[in-house]
């Protein structure tokens, strides 16, 4: 009997050989898988301050990869890893002080010196934050198999503040969140401090993110009460060792709501005094508090315009309250009203007249495009135009308009297109990135924000591949010159596998995924044709009686028997005039307008000849169908990857790709059948036929109010 049991155990173990252990994705890109000794650096000892978070983090990772900690000063000195600042005499001997000081407290040097049996790899910085970022960079090289014994790396961040915006509510829900409830778990604080806070901090620090806004921009005044400030303090305590500062979104009417003041007028001395006292209170509790994020006079929220004041007057009042403590105000430019004016023009029209009127500790936070995180938008014309005021880009990591956490969409390609867009506002080469990182327009503050896609789901982001967008935001915030290809490869190597048979096809899938989603959702510059409210799926026919026109798809697509698209030329809304020359000219003329943005700027006849000689209608059909077919190719590709992925993550991604494939057909059928009622043209016969009836699709109403 015992022999039989032993035999069964042996058979089971043989069957298990080659099968990868299941993973839930909770370790993100910080898996630090065990490696063969030959594939690890030849470090024989580590030196530095034992209390340094950088040294501790490196040792924590090294132990997982090698099975043991590196010895300290007592170890062999054949290959020493030295992690230290200019306070360390050995660092001063190996690295020039001026060289380090020019990189600032967040910059670092990684350099290997010596040869043979006497080598030293030094990670050096003038600040503890720089040491931490340098240690993570070294770990990234080891994880990705890119480490060498000839390292000579010098880096510093492109943006000073690299910040996540959490749209998390105090009741635990997350607006536009698709990965579970809020990780902050306000109801359990102060008694229960989740270990996830430290894991969150570690993940962010590993990619250079140094700030976070804890609560929704649609803020409630309660966040500024003593009860919640104590909870914020506890979160800040967990994030601080990883050099992450905490910020809060505030409600502009807080003085009236919390103190019972007659109003919240920014020119009211009582209101000004209330904010100064509140700032004093916050900094007494959280000495390194970062400042406020403000959404004002937008989508029904209160703001200075309620009292006849300007955005500058509102922002400056808050800035004055924060100034003595070193705090800043991030004032959002996402403003629009249900007027007759083109929504795409409104932020520019409200903020351009205020250029130069903001305090130096105010920075205007501007969404990448002029509408609202659409699958593809042109860059906002504010970038490069406001030269006397600091501007920061706001990107959306969470996929509000790109399939939630059901669709695989790698956003680094979208963000690279945006950051590299040439505004021409200071001549050729005036890319958005250079207009905002201090290169062309020096300001005391530079920053970039990303709306987080993080929740309580085990894998943090709902979809395993959505983790790549969190990672990509951090990498681009640190260095916007890194390519999307490099980011994808790093993430795949750390999160899944280094195997070329896995790495290369999956990287290609990621790089194609954004354009694929644009094609099956809103190609050729179409925008805002999604379902009412929750924004999941197509609803180009949506018409809600009494609703604001600028919340309805027909406002944007303007489909008729004559054609489709929004005329923003000089003979239309004239939104093109907000761009600098020659960009404005290029967008204005249908012959020179990029086809990817054609229907954003032009109302185009259905039979308009495209560059490939197809008509507009035909090209639209082929774009939608191409998106569908590409997702199906993703499915086939992923199925071939099964030998390289653990079963849990493989099945999860496989299941999500099935949803994405069905959704792509839904989008294609809905949009082509609906727009065909205007064009009156046949769908090209070599394209897969619709499988739905239009009236059937119009009946779809999803209840997604509580998706998280």
Provide a role label for each language-model segment.
Residues 1-7:
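Positively charged n-region of N-terminal signal peptides that target proteins for export
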Residues 7-16:
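Bacterial N-terminal signal peptides
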Residues 13, 20-116, 149-150:
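Acidic, contiguous N-terminal accessory segments
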Residues 46-52, 82-88, 124-126, 168, ...:
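Structural motif
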Residues 50-57, 61, 97-293, 323, ...:
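Feature activates predominantly on carbohydrate-active enzymes
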Residues 57-68, 138-145, 285, 321-325, ...:
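Structured segments of extracytoplasmic/periplasmic soluble domains
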Residues 188, 226, 234, 260-489, ...:
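Catalytic-core regions of glycoside hydrolase
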Residues 430-708:
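Catalytic domains of carbohydrate-active enzymes that cleave complex glycans
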């Amino acid at each position: 009997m015992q022999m039989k049991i032993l035999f069964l155990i042996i058979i089971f173990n043989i069957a298990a050989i080659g099968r990868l252990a299941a993973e839930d994705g909770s370790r993100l890109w910080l898996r630090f898988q065990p490696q063969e000794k030959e594939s690890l650096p030849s470090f024989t000892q580590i030196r530095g301050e034992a209390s340094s978070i950088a040294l501790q983090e490196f040792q924590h990772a090294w132990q997982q990869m090698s099975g043991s900690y590196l010895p300290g000063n007592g170890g062999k000195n054949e290959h020493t890893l030295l992690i230290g600042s200019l306070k360390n005499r050995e660092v001063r001997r190996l690295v020039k002080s001026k060289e380090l000081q020019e990189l600032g407290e967040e910059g670092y040097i990684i350099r290997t010196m010596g040869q043979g049996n006497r080598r030293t790899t030094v990670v050096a910085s003038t600040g503890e934050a720089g040491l931490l970022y340098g240690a993570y960079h070294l770990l990234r090289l080891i994880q990705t198999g890119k480490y060498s014994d000839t390292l000579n790396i010098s880096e510093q961040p492109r943006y000073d503040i690299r910040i996540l915006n959490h749209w998390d509510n105090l009741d635990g829900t997350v607006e536009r969140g698709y990965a579970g409830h809020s990780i902050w778990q306000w109801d359990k604080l102060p008694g229960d401090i989740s270990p996830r806070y430290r894991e969150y901090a570690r993940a962010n620090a590993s990619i250079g993110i140094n700030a976070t806004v804890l609560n929704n921009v649609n803020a409630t005044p309660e966040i500024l009460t003593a009860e919640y400030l104590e909870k914020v303090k506890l979160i800040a305590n967990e994030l601080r060792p990883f050099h992450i500062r905490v910020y809060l979104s505030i409600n502009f009417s807080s003085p009236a709501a919390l103190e019972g003041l007659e109003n919240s007028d920014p020119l009211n001395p009582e209101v000004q005094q209330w904010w100064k006292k509140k700032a004093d209170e916050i900094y007494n509790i959280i000495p390194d508090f970062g400042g406020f994020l403000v959404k004002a006079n937008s989508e029904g929220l209160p703001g200075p315009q309620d009292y006849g004041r300007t955005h500058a007057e509102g922002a400056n009042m808050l800035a004055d309250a924060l100034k003595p403590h070193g705090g800043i105000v991030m004032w959002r430019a996402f403003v629009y009203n249900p007027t007759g004016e083109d929504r795409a023009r409104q932020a520019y029209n409200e903020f351009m007249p205020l250029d130069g009127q903001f305090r130096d500790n105010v920075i205007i936070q501007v969404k990448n495009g002029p509408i609202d995180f659409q699958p593809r938008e042109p860059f906002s014309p504010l970038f490069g135009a406001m030269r006397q005021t600091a501007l920061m880009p706001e990107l959306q990591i969470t996929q509000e308009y790109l399939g939630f956490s059901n669709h695989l969409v790698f956003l680094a390609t979208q963000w690279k297109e945006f950051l590299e867009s040439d505004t021409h506002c200071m001549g050729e080469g005036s890319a958005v990135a250079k207009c905002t990182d201090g290169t062309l327009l020096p300001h005391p503050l530079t920053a970039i924000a990303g709306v987080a896609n993080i929740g309580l789901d085990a894998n943090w982001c709902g979809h395993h591949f959505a983790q790549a967008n969190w990672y990509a935001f951090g990498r681009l915030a640190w260095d916007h010159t890194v390519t999307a290809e490099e980011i994808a490869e790093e993430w795949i190597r750390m999160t899944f596998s280094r195997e070329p048979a896995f790495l290369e096809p999956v990287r290609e899938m990621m790089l194609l995924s954004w354009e694929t989603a644009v094609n099956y959702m809103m190609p050729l510059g179409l925008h805002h044709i999604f379902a009412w409210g929750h924004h999941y799926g197509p609803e180009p026919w949506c018409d809600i009686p009494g609703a604001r026109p600028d919340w309805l798809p027909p406002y944007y697509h303007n489909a008729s028997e004559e054609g489709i698209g929004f005329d923003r030329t000089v003979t239309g809304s004239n939104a093109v005039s907000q761009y600098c020359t020659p960009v404005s000219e290029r967008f204005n003329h249908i012959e020179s307008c990029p086809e990817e943005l054609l229907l954003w700027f032009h109302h185009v006849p259905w039979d308009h000849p495209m560059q490939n000689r197809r008509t507009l209608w035909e090209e639209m059909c082929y774009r939608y169908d191409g998106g569908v077919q590409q997702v199906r190719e993703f499915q086939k590709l992923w199925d071939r990857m099964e030998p390289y992925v653990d079963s849990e993550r493989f099945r999860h991604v496989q299941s999500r790709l099935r949803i994405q494939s069905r959704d792509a057909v839904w989008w294609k059928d809905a949009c082509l059948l609906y727009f065909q009622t205007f064009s009156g043209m046949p769908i090209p016969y070599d394209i897969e036929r619709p499988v739905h009836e239009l009236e059937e699709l119009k009946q779809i109403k999803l209840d997604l109010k509580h998706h998280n």
